[in-house]
Regions:
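Bacterial Sec-dependent N-terminal signal peptides
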Residues: 1-25
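Mature catalytic domains of secreted/periplasmic carbohydrate-active enzymes
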Residues: 23-457
Length: 457
């Protein structure tokens, strides 16, 4: 390394921990990453090129927005009997009545203040580079105007609004601002009679009938899924990522090979994220609510919420800007991307507290983003409280000091390995810092009086 730039700030914690919601406490990683031997590298050069571009972005946002946003409850899961061990329903309604109430939220979702321009401005200000928007979660409710179901925002109280096809307008606004574009789609659809057929009870997340006994039902569901994905891939502009959730539906083939073959004719190089289904259609992996212990030698992102939930809930405890920066820096040093979960309110805006916190993250990145964006991993990527990244040609090494929340910045920091061979500078201000080499260790004296932590920590 010819140069070593010292990035001082409130970044990665030495031991990563985060407040756990009920789901995390029960399951830990909701979608655990697999072994490197399970990853199948794409053979399509256009997909490989798109993956390389995506890996440069480092920081994305995942929007969950749907029926669950109206009462401010966990998304979809409360209508699934399998998940009673970690989610509780509000009130004392029997299951059938509760499900009827939940479906009926379609008549209450009326986002009169829907403002995708505000969403995009907040995320751009935060330094976010790619986006994933939930077009349909497991409950089957569509945020796009589908011809194949009436269970969508375009058929509720918002139907006469010129922006009733909210997915179209979200994608359109973000695309014009230069974000890489991702379309979230749930493979299971609990509202569709060809998935959860009303003739049978619904014991778990999967189809509630035997396909061998009802092959026509499953064929109808395959066709329904194909038709909806065709809509999204042909009527909603260009996409970089098709992000498919519901990987626990294993063995239920929706003809994804055919879907992707057709979609890539419309979107060359489209990245397929068939979550938790190891193989050729999972072009990058998505560990959820946690960070891998070590570097991984294949593409991946950690999906982590800004609050404790993916969708909007009232009075949510949000992570501090410092914690978000810590998480992003650790993930970057380990070779991944951070997909940050944000839930807009039921009336269609990003709430003020989210805006404030993400603004501080973005302010930090405006000075220190060189250590995050377009970087690559280094063989020695951590020592104590310091994380390392490098530029693509390997000529500049970035050292990111990990200041734990609540602690004061020390006057001197040190690390072993990755010793500087030339000047060391702060990214903010490009000023040199003093350092001393002592054997295999470097000691860096920090300049006094520099404000390097984000506000609101």
């Amino acid at each position: 390394m010819k140069n070593l730039k010292k990035l001082l700030g409130c970044v990665a914690l030495v031991t990563f921990s985060m407040s756990l919601s009920a789901q995390e406490q029960v399951q830990g990683f909701v979608h655990q990453q697999s072994k490197a031997t399970d990853y199948v590298w794409p053979t399509d050069q256009q997909v490989l090129d798109k993956l390389a571009k995506w890996q440069d972005q480092k920081f994305g946002v995942l929007f969950h927005w749907g029926l669950y946003s109206v009462p401010g409850i966990v998304e979809s899961w409360s209508i699934c009997s399998e998940d009673v061990d970690w989610i509780s329903r509000k009130g004392n309604l029997p299951y059938d009545e509760y499900k009827k109430w939940y479906w009926g939220l379609k008549d209450s979702l009326n986002p009169v203040n829907f403002n995708p321009e505000q969403w995009a401005e907040v995320m751009q200000d935060a330094g976010i580079k790619y986006m994933i928007f939930t077009t349909k979660h497991h409950d089957g409710f569509c945020t796009f105007d589908s011809k194949y179901t009436d269970f969508s925002i375009a058929n509720g109280p918002f139907k006469n609004n010129p922006r009733k096809d909210v997915a179209f307008h979200v994608f359109d606004v973000f695309r014009k601002k230069g974000f890489m574009m991702g379309c979230y789609f749930s493979k299971p659809d609990w509202h569709c009679e060809w998935f959860w057929n009303p003739y049978f009870a619904t014991a778990n997340r999967r189809i509630n009938y035997k396909k061998e006994n009802h092959p026509d039902w499953w064929k109808n569901y395959q066709t329904f899924t194909q038709n909806q994905l065709d809509e999204l891939m042909t009527r909603y502009g260009s996409f970089d990522i098709l992000w498919l959730d519901g990987g626990w539906v294993t063995g239920d083939d929706i003809n994804l090979d055919g879907i992707l073959e057709k979609a890539r004719k419309q979107h060359p190089g489209l990245i397929s994220v068939d979550r938790s289904i190891r193989g050729k259609n999972e072009n990058y992996q998505t560990p959820e609510r946690g960070i891998p212990e070590t570097q991984l030698d294949y593409p991946w992102e950690s999906c982590i919420t800004l609050s404790n939930d993916w969708g909007w809930v009232p009075n949510a405890p949000f992570k501090s800007p410092q914690k978000v920066i810590n998480i992003l820096s650790e993930i970057t040093a380990k070779g991944g991307c951070l997909l940050l979960g944000v839930g807009p309110t039921a009336d269609g805006v990003i709430e003020e507290e989210v805006t404030k916190r993400l603004h501080e993250v973005g302010k930090w990145l405006r000075f220190n983003g060189k250590a995050i964006y377009n970087t690559r991993i280094t063989p020695v990527y951590r020592d104590g409280n310091v994380w390392f990244t490098a530029d693509k040609d390997g000529k500049t090494l970035y050292a990111i000091y990990a200041l734990p929340e609540g602690e004061k910045l020390p006057e001197v920091i040190e690390w072993k390995g990755n010793l500087p061979k030339g000047n060391m500078k702060l990214l903010k201000g490009n000023k040199r810092v003093k350092y001393v080499l002592k054997g295999d260790k470097v000691e860096v004296t920090l300049p006094k009086g520099r404000a390097i932590c984000p506000k609101g920590t």
